[in-house]
């Protein structure tokens, strides 16, 4: 069964998705990673995406849907996909249903990690990602791990779009645009809301219990 993980930027969707991948042999389809890969490719589309992200804006549905379709046609895992960061609005939710129907697939569980803006601010402003191994640490919560990071502290970098004004803008935009999507999926009995402010392991255990159902 496929899964959708909802939650504002910094809610820990990526961390939880990685846990599901390891434990349940899922494939993580992150629109954030798709967009960043396109930016790294230096294509014209990638340049446009970088401008939008740097200004705290979301890219258009047309761009996201194009990248998503390209990925779906290359997926090796049927009915074992975690959609991380998609859909963001009702139009995308409808588009996802259409795409999955083309591949004879459906959504088995929809999970919303609910986290307040105050906590999100600290999580994102302190977030650092290793440019070599992609490990993510937080300067507020992982000071010892940062000092002992095997790749070296010099490889831990902050993302360009991680500044307070943009964090607030992204959070408010996400919550306002995603509310209709949550209402769209909450009508389904497979929709679950989880307090995303807890410890990572506690949240992981809750998700594992959901996936057993």
Curated annotation (Swiss-Prot):
Keyword terms: ATP-binding, Cytoplasm, Kinase, Nucleotide biosynthesis, Nucleotide-binding, Transferase
Gene Ontology biological process terms from the UniProt entry: AMP salvage
Region (LID): 126-162
Functional summary from the UniProt entry: Catalyzes the reversible transfer of the terminal phosphate group between ATP and AMP. Plays an important role in cellular energy homeostasis and in adenine nucleotide metabolism.
Region of interest: NMP: 30-59
NCBIfam families cross-referenced by the UniProt entry: adk (TIGR01351), PRK00279.1-3 (NF001381)
One Pfam family, short name: ADK
EC number: 2.7.4.3
Binding site for AMP: 31, 36, 57-59, 85-88, 92, 159, 170
Top-level division of the source organism's lineage: Bacteria
Entry domain remark: Consists of three domains, a large central CORE domain and two small peripheral domains, NMPbind and LID, which undergo movements during catalysis. The LID domain closes over the site of phosphoryl transfer upon ATP binding. Assembling and dissambling the active center during each catalytic cycle provides an effective means to prevent ATP hydrolysis.
Name this protein carries in UniProt: Adenylate kinase
